[in-house]
Amino acid sequence: MKKLFKKKKGVSPHMYMLPEESNSNTATNAPSYSVGGTTANSYSSNSYNDNNNSNSTYGSSNNYGNYGSSNNYGSYGASNTYGSNGSSNNYGNYGATNSNGDAGYSITPIRNDPYARKDMPPMKSSAAVTERPSMHRSAPSQDTLDLKKQELFAGARIQNDDESTTDTIPHNDDGTEGDEYGEGYRDGYEEDQEVEAIKQKIQFVKQDSLSSTRNALLMAGNAEQMGLATLANLGEQTEKIATAEKELDISKIHAKRAEEQARELKTLNRSMFAIHVPKPWGKAKRVAAEEARLAAKRDAERQDEMLNRQFAYRSQKRIDQAMKDNMKSNKKKGDSKGVSILERSHYQFEPDAEDDAMEKEIDGNLDQIGALATRLKGLAYATGQEIDSQNARLGSIHDKSDRLDTDVYLNVERLRHIH
């Protein structure tokens, strides 16, 4: 193989050796790289040729276009293409590809190149390449792009919000904020809130009033029932008082009769030598006086009986009248519908079916409460009169009972002295 090729000046014989015949200790040549669309490679094809050779088998061809250059090597060479946006180095079997983007570059070193120069400084490892300051700027990640988009659109949204806020707030000619729309809108909103608050308050007051009227009606009905029951009890008590007074009058009569018999018994119980002879003169007068006394006694008894009956009758009449008045007032229905319709508008903000029903029920409850109050007044008046009448009769009974007690005590003492 050495005979086929002649050694030329400036060309290393090792560069024409096959890969198998190359020295195993050949160091890795330095990588090729490009910056800004120009080729910067100290060990590229120009270093191995005296002149620019094109289409050589093992030579190199440099074709520079408008935006870069293209180096085409043979089977073991490399091709560097510089386009408008970067470069691409295509090597053969033992080559590497360098891709340059818009900004910076990337380097892929060629290791163990059999055609590299012997006199180039060997590279110990791939770390030597990585130690070089890389000017390649890696492509931004998706998170970085999302952050940048958010920043961009956030600024746009902030600007739009500022513009919309500025547009919605009216300004006067002097640059100050106007009150034609903003304050009018706020005032309208506040008025709506006040109206809603008033409506809710009216509704609450109506419900409270309805509940109060229902409770008052229930309590008034209970009071009426208790008043009627009390009046009925007073009627029964009047009858009992009249009966007690009648029995007291009868007891008084028996006490008077016992007094007479005790006096007669005393006369008959005298000594047997004391002869009792009635006086012969004045007999008619004595008889007339006795009859007058008995008549007066009977008249007093009759008067007491009549007073007792009058007391019972008047008491029953008062009770019956109170009952009749109560029933009559209960059956009477006041027609206040027209007045309620006229006055209802003063208490309604937005009348509807529910509101009308509430107002109607409130009016009805108030009417019933008024009627119940009237009936309760009648019951209270009748009850007061009945209690006063009973108190008077009870006072009379107290006096009669005291006199009867005195008469009974005297009769007992008279009988005790008879022996």
Swiss-Prot record:
Summarizing the annotation, the consequence of altering L228P is: In sec9-10; temperature-sensitive
Gene encoding the protein: sec9
Q: Where is the composition biased (Polar residues)?
A: 21-32
Record-level GO BP terms: ascospore-type prospore membrane formation; exocytosis; Golgi to plasma membrane transport; intracellular protein transport; vesicle fusion
Q: Where is the composition biased (Low complexity)?
A: 36-60
Q: Which family does it belong to?
A: Belongs to the SNAP-25 family.
Tree of life domain: Eukaryota
Bias (Basic residues) ranges: 1-11
Please give the organism.
Answer: Schizosaccharomyces pombe (strain 972 / ATCC 24843)
Q: Name one GO molecular function term.
A: syntaxin binding
Q: Which UniProt keywords apply?
A: Coiled coil, Phosphoprotein, Protein transport, Repeat, Transport
Q: Is Phosphoprotein found in the keyword set?
A: yes
Residue list for modification Phosphoserine? S141
* Disordered: region residues: 1-60, 116-143, 156-186
The identity of this protein, by name, is: Protein transport protein sec9
**Residue ranges constituting the t-SNARE coiled-coil homology domain according to the UniProt record:** 203-265, 356-418
GO CC term (a single one): plasma membrane
Sum up the protein's function in the record's words.
Answer: Has a role in cell separation, a final step of cytokinesis and in the assembly of the forespore membrane. May have a role in the transport of secretory proteins to these growing sites.
